[in-house]
UniProtKB/Swiss-Prot annotation:
GO terms for cellular component: cytoplasm; ribonucleoprotein complex; ribosome. Belongs to the bacterial ribosomal protein bL33 family. Signal peptide: none annotated. InterPro entries: Ribosomal_bL33, Ribosomal_bL33_CS, Ribosomal_bL33_sf, Ribosomal_zn-bd. One of its GO terms (molecular function) is structural constituent of ribosome. Keywords: Ribonucleoprotein, Ribosomal protein. This is Large ribosomal subunit protein bL33B. The gene is rpmG2. The keyword Ribonucleoprotein applies. It holds the Pfam family Ribosomal_L33. It comes from Bacillus pumilus (strain SAFR-032). GO terms for biological process: translation.
Length: 49
């Protein structure tokens, strides 16, 4: 079961990315290191509601 999720920057809080995840394989909130255009560097982006 794939669902759409939004990834938000942990430093500035801006929601930068929309992606999909499989809830069966990843039931917890996912974290990725992605580029934040507001901070102009790579930061940890966490799944939000």
């Amino acid at each position: 079961m794939r669902v759409n999720i939004t990834l938000a920057c942990t430093e500035c809080g801006e929601r930068n990315y929309i992606t999909k995840k499989n809830k069966r394989n990843n039931p917890d909130r996912v974290e990725f290191k992605k580029y934040c255009s507001r901070d102009k560097k790579q930061t940890v982006h966490r799944e939000t509601k």
